[in-house]
Amino acid sequence: MNNSVYILEDRAIIYVNGEDAKDFLQNLISNDINKVTNNSSCFTSLLTPQGKFLFEFIVAKHKSGFFIDCEKTQSDQIFKQLNLYKIRSKVEILNLSNEFVVASFGYEKYLSIENSKDILGFTFKYREDPIILDPRNKNLGARLIINLEKLYLSLKKLDLKDDK
C-alpha cells in the first residue's frame, strides 16, 4: 500500500459560514447543498444566473459552515463572485488558502483509515478536519482539508509520508 501524501498546491480553500450559509449556497450551486453533511461532500458548479458554467469545486461541511475546495487560480474570482451575490445574506465568506491546505492520498490508504467507507463523497472527521473520498471517482483518492499548523503531526498519526 502506498502511504504517500501529496500537498495539492494548486488548490485553495474558501469558507462560507453564517446563519444563511446553507440557503445562500443552495441558491448558487448546481448540486443540492442538503446532500452536504458531516458524512457527505459533493462536487458541484457555480453558474451564471443564465445557467452558464463558471467554476467547479468540491463542497464539504466544516463546523457550522462549508469548505469550498477549488482551483487556486480561480479562488479570487470565486471569492468575488460569492461576495457579489451576498447582498443582505447573513453569511461570512473567507479565503482561507493561507491557513488551510488540501492533502491528497490514495484510495487504498483511505480505506485503511478507521471510519472510512467506500462511498463516493463519503466524509468523516479526523479530529475536526474533513477527510473526503473524492466525490467524482474513487480512483482519484481522498482529500484531507487541514490547517497548516496541524498538517505534519496529522500526517504522522495517519501514517502518511509527504512526497513533495
Question: Each PLM stretch: what is its role?
Answer:
Residues 1-164:
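Basic, glycine/lysine-rich polyanion-binding surfaces/domains
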